[in-house]
Amino acid sequence: MKKKNHKYRGKKLNRGESPNFSGQHLMHNKKLIEEIVDRANISIDDTVLELGAGKGALTTVLSQKAGKVLAVENDSKFVDILTRKTAQHSNTKIIHQDIMKIHLPKEKFVVVSNIPYAITTPIMKMLLNNPASGFQKGIIVMEKGAAKRFTSKFIKNSYVLAWRMWFDIGIVREISKEHFSPPPKVDSAMVRITRKKDAPLSHKHYIAFRGLAEYALKEPNIPLCVALRGIFTPRQMKHLRKSLKINNEKTVGTLTENQWAVIFNTMTQYVMHHKWPRANKRKPGEI
């Protein structure tokens, strides 16, 4: 079998640098690391999950603040370093495994991570696709472009909309690529995710809502009445517009989470179940 060429094949690495096959960029700025932990606002009552622990720069600080730290790392060399650095911290467990193959904690947990850019979307899906999980809040460092897509007021994607029905997602601040080793080609962002105390929908409706969101956001720039005409009758749509207090030109991509809740509740109350749109199954990295 012919070997597949990799973008790092033949690249000369700096001293101490490991091949970065997952898109992992390690933070080395101590003030930035302390800021991340401070903004996470964790206590000894918290179980903290760190995804992509690297050499433990963030892990060691988390170990001093949290009740329990679960540090996930797949690189064997990094795992050895992590094990040595956290040897004195009995509250810290090193999980030597692929991030996408782990089982999330059953208890309530917090995520504080500088995640590998290459698997940003799969990680977000893992954390947010099940609103009934124990995930409560997080501070996650990710590629700036992804952060902007997840937080944009104009919503184009059904997954992002569904996540934001149950979680608040916002950019805390941008981070220069100079704070990482090896430095990425683009800047990063610190993102805060918080579970909504009063979500507009029950988490049991997640799959059904995803179906509605996926159907409606096929063309996010078109008017709502056009996007949903396959679901609602003209009479139902007229009633819905009055409930939403919008005109005929309101586009689906500009609706708020609360307006989407009204649309979903109207559908479940007045539309026959067989007319409800179904969500398509996608691969973990697709969005």
From Swiss-Prot:
Induction: By erythromycin and oleandomycin. It is an enzyme of class 2 (transferase). InterPro entries: KsgA/Erm, rRNA_Ade_diMease-like_C, rRNA_Ade_Mease_Trfase_CS, rRNA_Ade_methylase_Trfase_N, SAM-dependent_MTases_sf. One of its GO terms (molecular function) is RNA binding. Its EC number is 2.1.1.-. Residues 1-13 have a biased composition (Basic residues). S-adenosyl-L-methionine binds at residues 25, 27, 52, 73, 98, 114. Residues 1-21 are annotated as: Disordered. PANTHER family: DIMETHYLADENOSINE TRANSFERASE, DIMETHYLADENOSINE TRANSFERASE-RELATED. This is rRNA adenine N-6-methyltransferase.
